[in-house]
Amino acid sequence: MKGNEFRNQTQTTIKNELAEWSDNSNNSQVDYASNAPSGDHVLVDWDGPNDPKNPKNWPHSAFLIHTILVSMLCLAGNLATTMYAPGAAQLAVEFKTRDTTTIALTVSIYLLGFALAPMVTSPLSEVYGRLIVYHTSNIFFLGFNLACAFSSNIGMFIAFRFLAGCAGSAPMTVGGGTIADFAASPEKNNTALRLFALGPLLGPVIGPIVGGFVAENIGWRWTFRIMSIVIAVLSILSCIFLRETSAAAILGRRGARITKETGKPFMIPGPMPGMPPKPQQPTKEIVSRSLVRPMKMLIFLPQVLILSFYTAFVFGLIYLLFTTFPAVFEGQYGFSPGVSGLSYIGIGFGMVGALFLFNFINMKMSNRTDKHGQLIPESYLPLMTWFSPLLPIGFFWYGWSADKQTHWVVPILGTFFVGFGSFAIIMPTTAYLVYAQGPQGAASVLAASNMMRYVFAAFLPLAGQNMYDQLGLGWGNSLLGFLCVVLAPVPAIFQRYGHYLRERFPTEF
C-alpha cells in the first residue's frame, strides 16, 4: 500500500478516534448488493447508491446540524470538567472540610468518568447505534449535574460528580463517528472534525472563566444549575434534530427485520474498504473486545505503554494546574474567584498555538514514506522532539515567578509555555500511535491511551496542593519541571528507534 493511500485511509480513523470511535464504525464503500445471499447469511446493504436512508445521501443541511449539535454536546461535557473549579473553596466552607486532597477530588473525579465510561458506551453505540447513546447520556448528564447542584454533603457530591463525568463523556466517544458517517468532502469533513475537536481543547479553559464569575456572584451551586440549563437545551435540540447516522446500526435493524421474516442470519459490509462482509457479532463479544484489547496493548506493546504513560503524565500535569490555579492566584495575588478564572487564558492560548503549529507541520512532514512506499509513523514526532523542552521551562517560569509574586502576567505567560509544550507532546503522540497501529488497531490504541490519560488527570491533581504546601510554588513546580526533563528524551528515542519497536512488537490481537 502506498504512503498516500495509507495516510488517506487512516486519516479518517485518527480524526474519528478523537472520540474513541469503535472499530466497527462504517466508513466503507458499499457494493450495493442489498439482500444478496452469502452462504447461510443474507447480505444486508443499502438499496442502491441513492438510498435516502444512507447518511451519505442526506442534504448538506443535515450534515451542518449534526456537526454543530454534536460539537456543542462535546463542548458542554468538557466545560463541566473545570467550570466548578473556582467555586471549590466555597464548597469546602459550606461542607466544612479543609482537606485539600478531598477538595481537589471534587474537581478531578469527573475525569475518572471520562476514563472508564467510554469502555462501555463505545461498544453500546456499536450495537444499538449512536442516537440512543446521545439521548440516554444527555438525560443522565442533566440528572447528575442537578444532583451535584443540590448535594447536601461532600460524599454525595463526589459520587454524583463522578457519574456526571461518565455521562458527559459520551459525545466525545461517539461524536467523531457521527461526523464521519456523512462522508462529506475532505475539506468539509476536516473543518467539521476540527470544530468537534475544539471541545476538549477549549472547554477546560472557558469553563473556569465562566464558572469563576458565576461562583463569585451567585455561588458554586449555580455553576451546576447553569450547566444543567445548557444541557437541557442541547438535549431538547438533540431530540428534535439528531437522527441515527451509524450505518452499522441502520443496516443492523434492517437485517434484524429480514432475520425475523426469513429466519436467516444476516451480514453487513465490512467496516473498511476492501474488507469482506461480516455477520452481526454478539453484544458480549463486542463489549469484551472493547475492554480486553486496549489492556492487551498496554501490557504487550511497550511502545504503546511508554508513550501512553508519557502523554498521561503530561495530561495529568495540566489538570494539576487547573485544580490549583484558583488557590495560587487568589492566595498570591488576591484575585477574586471571578478574576482567578482568567488565569486559565495563558495555558489555553498555548494549547491553541500548538494545535495550529501541529496542523502546519503535519502538512509538511507527514508524507514521508519508506523504501516500500509506506507511511513512516515517526514522521509525526519531530514536533514533539523540538518543543517538549518548553514544558519544563514553563513549569520553572510559572513556579518561581508566582513564588516571588512578580507581576501576575509573568506566571500566566509561563503557563503559555506549559500549554504549548504539553500539546506539542500529546498531539504528535496520538498521531504516531494511530498510524503505527494502522486502521484496525487505531480504536483500541486510542482507547488505551485515553483511559490512562484521564486516570492520571483524575488522580495526579490530588497531590498538587499538598505538594505546594510542603515545597512552595517555586520548588513544587520545579519538581514537576525536573520530572519533565527526565522524560524529555522519550521523543528523540522513539524518533530514532520507534521502527525497531514496531517490528519487534507488532499488533497481533
Curated annotation (Swiss-Prot):
CDD domains associated with the record: MFS_Tpo1_MDR_like (cd17323)
Ranges that cross the membrane: 63-83, 103-123, 139-159, 162-182, 195-215, 222-242, 298-318, 341-361, 380-400, 408-428, 442-462, 474-494
Keywords assigned: Cell membrane, Glycoprotein, Membrane, Transmembrane, Transmembrane helix
Glycosylation sites: N8, N26, N189, N367
Pfam families membership: MFS_1
Compartments (UniProt record): Cell membrane
Superkingdom of the organism of origin: Eukaryota
PROSITE patterns: MFS
Coiled coil ranges: none
Membrane topology term: Multi-pass membrane protein
InterPro entries: MFS, MFS_dom, MFS_trans_sf
Keyword Translocase: no
MF term (GO), any: transmembrane transporter activity
UniProt KW Kinase keyword: no
Cellular component, GO, one term: plasma membrane
Similarity comment: Belongs to the major facilitator superfamily.
Function of the protein: Efflux pump that might be required for efficient secretion of fusaridione A or other secondary metabolies produced by the fusaridione A gene cluster.
Name of the featured protein: MFS transporter fsdG
Gene: fsdG
